[in-house]
């Protein structure tokens, strides 16, 4: 059955809606006070409604109720799929919509406000930590829809999975807090909630034309009405937006866009007005510090293992911890900045399933070794069983620039100090063995039919036999030894961080990683070897160390092939890894074959 199309003017709708909500006779002055519409406009609208049979004896009639039906809200969609990265570290433990603010769980308060307005058809779109929301179906009768693309797409993916449900629909975010109920059973037209911001702002600033229609939106501005909170789609908007979304959804450039960006790009075709709310009614929290400012008791009532770890480690109260912001979010780690007093720190939270990827006990053994040697001054403490770690934050630091000889020299000497420490680690790490492990993963997706793959593999295995025969020593090694894992402080001092892959390895392993991942030229690589040895390396040493460039390249090449088989796109790194394996292997094999096998070993000198 096709929904009816509304024929009321805005003033007529306002008058009838006021009478519907009151469910009692109202004078024109009472309607004026309820709708904030001028008395003259109210008078004209009342007379028109009386003439149409919508009002009798200052009450809404059955015909008036029927005239409001096209404006009845069908349903609501609450988007709760996102990672909420800016809300670190709390979002590491639970989704933002499940936080308790002023004594109420954010999404539960919003559902109850929708129910109070008579809206019971509610869909919650979930993704990250979706299991935290499942109970809402039993408790509140909501429908749960899973957005599996929440990692790879912005919130347009959440509207995509419910696009057929869009009609007269409220579209909400699970983490908003409304101090008064903004929801209504009947709404005249599509709108975006807005609050006024004085002075400069980085919020989305709205420009309007006649009737309050939104004509443009800019990111950032000053003294402006800004997008803030919930949105209402009427049927016309939903139909138009769904058509546009279906046209652009598969385009690669659409994936990272907010749905609002898609709307703005087609703003001429989609009618939506601005609805103004007084300051303080709509509350969006972009950081932990913001919600703490809104609810002073938030931290005291927060059940968080992360904050317990911080408080116990640093001997502070939970309310002493401030200035949170995310640093990075990846496959193995989630990291955020925080401060206690004037001191700054980093909290590392283990990613989901990383206990199957990373040997945390080996990592922490290496972290303690690096701290003892002064190679990593940032590490404070952590828990190898649970995977969390607290480190010092180095302000104004940057990553290593391997093109600067002085910095490359400092890095290679640091590696040499690690190797000469006389210490040992329980774990062993070998690039070729790791590559073979990745190869087994790759085979799980079908036969390896990459041209000349097995030819290259055979050469790598032969080179490994020759390099092993050199009998260079095993030593504690970082094994992820490249510029992004170095921090350079303002004085130029280095710290080597992220020891997840550390173990006992051939002393050439770290050199191999540096050449591959920093994409050093042959001349730069040879210079790095001179820095490492403190002299010009012998031909035997050079041959052996450059072999580990091949091994590192091949290992990560096979890893990249496996990731591509899984559906990930590693980009140009697949080629970079491949080239470092294939470009050197023939030359090195020839060097080994022509070298005298009885060439004496030359011990490196410091």
Predicted regions mapped to residue ranges:
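Conserved core of the sugar-phosphate nucleotidyltransferase
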Residues: 14, 179-254
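N-terminal nucleotide-binding beta1-loop-alpha1 segment
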Residues: 59-92
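Conserved beta-loop-beta/alpha segment of the NTase-like Rossmann-fold superfamily
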Residues: 131-205
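Active-site activation/catalytic loop segments of kinase-like enzymes and analogous catalytic loops
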Residues: 212, 508-537, 550-568, 587
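ATP/Mg2+ or Mg2+-diphosphate-binding catalytic cores
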Residues: 295, 299-303, 558-606
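An alpha-helical support segment within catalytic cores of ATP-dependent transferases
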Residues: 305-323, 423-479, 491, 581, ...
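ATP-binding pocket architecture of kinase catalytic cores
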Residues: 325-432, 439, 446-455, 471
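Active-site acidic catalytic loop and adjacent metal/ATP-binding pocket
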Residues: 325-347, 462-511
